[in-house]
Design a protein with these regions (language model features):
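Divalent-metal (often Zn2+) His-rich catalytic cores of metallo-beta-lactamase-fold enzymes
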Residues: 28-45, 49, 305, 315, ...
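Metallo-beta-lactamase
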Residues: 120, 144-145, 152-155, 169, 212-288, 332-341, ...
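TPR-adjacent "capping" and linker segments in tetratricopeptide-repeat scaffold/adaptor proteins
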Residues: 371, 439-462
């Protein structure tokens, strides 16, 4: 009985891949040759060099401050031999001058994100940075160390903790804090907590309220689609180099490695909550529905240290990531930052976040928080203002400009989020996908509309002739739109694929946003080479399964049901879990799988009694359902083949599906 695989955004990451000359022929027969930067792209870069304060080196000083030591080349290996993380392929970033194929502002951010190792923030507070996309913060108490966020992978977290021990001495981990629900902040928890600590329950795991609900909802329900879309956001399959992946804004990239979700033992419920942890007092502020649906900030009076999690970073953050998520609330985000100023303004002497580098000095800290507050408030209010003048999302994105006071702040640049796509997210939050123009109410899908566009525009050769001319003239955005219609109409047109790839490439070279660059360059690569091949998705880990409620497992089963194949079927199954005391009825009817809790159905097709732990073993493929029945772990009555019939109606989600070209296989 398979529910679904581990829904991580990093499990296809070929870490440590270096750039190679891209000249091989792809499976589509298109020469995989990257092009030089167009003169118009170079002109854009020169204009940016003149517009932004590149002589300001304060960020570089802050990023290097307090350095104690690192791991050579930032390289972390998995016990099975594969590379979990390595900065060695990014050696090309040693040059201060950006090449023509990388936006100079993004080049600057990419170089800042190369600082890696253990850093002292203030005596008693340390950070491991640059060994994952996220940071691990280590806070010394009276007898041990408190770990804030455990990076993406178990291997990375273990290496980070060992690095701290090597330079600061071995101390027991006395508590773990998860600032929010994204995988790069909790995935490595088993790397800092040994089996005894977990079994004894003596080490508290502290997290914001509703942590578990939100930690699993993104990764489990929409995981397959998110995983594929994340490849465009982070660029894991791009070669690393001046013509490939250079950064992702928040850090270098997602880490590979083993991930496990541990359930918190202590939830922070409200702003003003305090905890005394190993003699150190923490003051908490709740920040739900900001960068994550469950997130929190904290201040430590002993160290005069402020940590705003991921809500005050050295870039304009995402309000809607390319991988997909619920739209984040820019208005609430700005209010939380304003509240942080009211709570702790003038009190903090150091501020560190869970990405990027710290800031020191109360005046600089308060200035940065105010500017970040106003960045999200400006984006929110001006989007709504223009929306209420009747502008659509696309029109607002084309119109809005940050005020000069924010535009010139390095930490307000759009390396991860970007003003142009963040305003579209704000529009979506309030008005949804529809712009009220009836032409967009029920348009043709891409293949059908592509064929009609090609017909209306005079055929493929006419489009290609005009596209070549406009590409040379730097009209990349419309050339991409026109050629995309042609590729969807005729995906085997090698000339169209190659020209669209060249166009995406120029858009990537021009992009200041790392995520935009990754998306454009990966789109170009897939047009030239086709989709990369990946390994089968692994089953969910026992730790992740144990962290899920049984009702969440049924939700996952429901989204896998193939409705058309289930039409006309009615299956009712009773479940009784002996270890948790839970009972459920699963009901397939009207091509929908529903469940009721704390009841059993009379006349059910079959009934199963088992431990929830046994179900976890089956899903994790540590045993099979028939083996568990034969071994006495599952007791059944009725027609067990009805369960097999139900499972036969489940889809297996592919790891890969086409994005920049039509789906090759029909989906029903």
């Amino acid at each position: 009985m398979a529910i679904g695989g581990e829904m991580r955004l990093d499990d296809c990451q070929p870490a440590g891949r270096e750039e190679k000359p891209m000249i091989e022929s792809s499976s589509h027969g298109t020469a995989n040759m990257s092009k030089d930067a167009n003169p118009s792209v170079i002109a854009q870069h020169e204009a940016m060099l003149n517009a932004l304060p590149f002589s300001d080196m304060r960020d570089f000083e802050d990023a290097a401050r307090g350095f104690l030591g690192t791991i050579e080349n930032g390289k972390i290996d998995h016990p099975q031999g594969r590379v979990v993380w390595s900065l060695e392929p990014y050696g090309f970033l040693g040059s201060e001058q950006a090449p023509p194929t990388v936006n100079p502002s993004l080049w600057r951010q990419s170089r800042l994100n190369m600082h890696h190792g253990l850093f002292e923030v203030v005596p008693g507070v340390y950070q491991v940075r640059g060994l994952d996309i996220a940071n691990m913060t280590l806070i010394e108490g009276d007898s041990g160390v408190i770990v804030v966020d455990t990076l993406t992978s178990i291997e990375g977290a273990r290496a980070a903790l060992e690095l701290y021990f090597r330079h600061c001495g071995t101390r027991p981990v006395v508590a773990v804090i998860f600032t929010h629900t994204h995988t790069d902040h909790w995935g490595g928890a088993r790397g800092v907590l040994d089996g005894h600590a977990l079994a004894s329950g003596q080490v508290p795991i502290i997290a914001p309220n509703l942590f578990m609900e939100h930690a699993v909802s993104e990764n489990i329900i929409a995981g397959p689609a998110m995983l594929r879309r994340a490849q465009y956001q982070f660029g894991p399959f791009l070669a690393k180099g001046p013509r490939g992946q250079v950064d992702c804004g928040l850090g270098k990239s997602m880490a590979a490695g083993s991930v496990a979700l541990l359930r918190p033992t202590d939830l922070i419920m409200a702003t003003g909550d305090k905890r005394m942890i190993d003699g150190v007092e923490f003051e908490f502020q709740m920040a739900p529905n900001s960068e994550a649906p469950a997130e929190m900030h904290f201040f430590i009076p002993r160290y005069k240290l402020l940590n705003l999690a991921e809500n005050c970073t050295h870039n304009f953050h995402n309000l809607l990531p390319f991988r997909g998520a619920d739209v984040r609330d820019a208005l609430a985000w700005s209010k939380y930052l304003n509240e942080a100023l009211q709570l702790w303004g003038g009190k903090a002497e150091a501020m560190c976040g869970q990405h990027h580098w710290p800031v020191w000095g109360s005046e600089r800290i308060d200035t940065m928080i105010r500017q970040q507050r106003d960045l999200y408030k400006f984006a929110h209010d001006q989007t709504i203002r223009l929306m209420n003048h009747g502008l659509t999302a696309a029109e607002i994105a084309e119109t809005i400009r940050l005020p000069k006071s924010l535009e010139g702040a390095w930490h307000g640049r759009g390396y991860y989020g970007h003003i142009r796509h963040n305003v579209k997210a704000i529009y979506q939050k309030y008005l949804g996908w529809y712009d009220a123009n009836p032409v967009n109410l029920d348009p043709l899908p891409p293949v059908a509309s592509g064929r009609k566009y090609v017909e209306y525009m005079g055929g493929a050769e006419a489009i290609l002739a005009r596209a070549r001319k406009d590409l040379d003239n730097g009209e990349f955005r419309f050339v991409a739109q026109a050629l995309s219609h042609l590729v969807f109409a005729d995906p085997d047109n090698q000339t169209a694929r190659a020209l669209l790839a060249d166009t995406f490439e120029q858009l990537g070279y021009a992009a200041e946003s790392a995520t935009w660059r990754n998306a454009y360059l990966f789109g170009a690569q897939e047009l030239r080479q086709g989709m990369p091949k990946t390994l089968p998705r692994p089953p969910m880990s026992r730790e992740t399964l144990a962290a899920l409620r049984t009702s969440q497992l049924w939700d996952v089963l429901g989204i896998r049901l193939n409705g058309p194949r289930a039409e006309g079927k009615h299956i009712v199954l009773n479940w009784n879990f002996s270890d948790t005391g839970e009972t459920f009825v699963l009901n397939l009817e009207n091509s929908a799988l529903t469940y009721s809790e704390s009841v059993q159905a009379e006349g059910a097709d079959a009934s199963f009694t088992l431990a929830r732990a046994t179900l976890d073993e089956v899903i994790a493929k540590q045993t099979s359902f028939p083996e568990a029945v034969a071994g006495g772990k599952i007791k059944l009555s009725g027609n067990a083949m009805r369960l097999a019939e139900l499972m036969g109606l489940m889809d297996e989600f592919p790891r890969m599906f086409e994005i920049v070209e039509p789906k090759r296989a029909a989906v029903t």
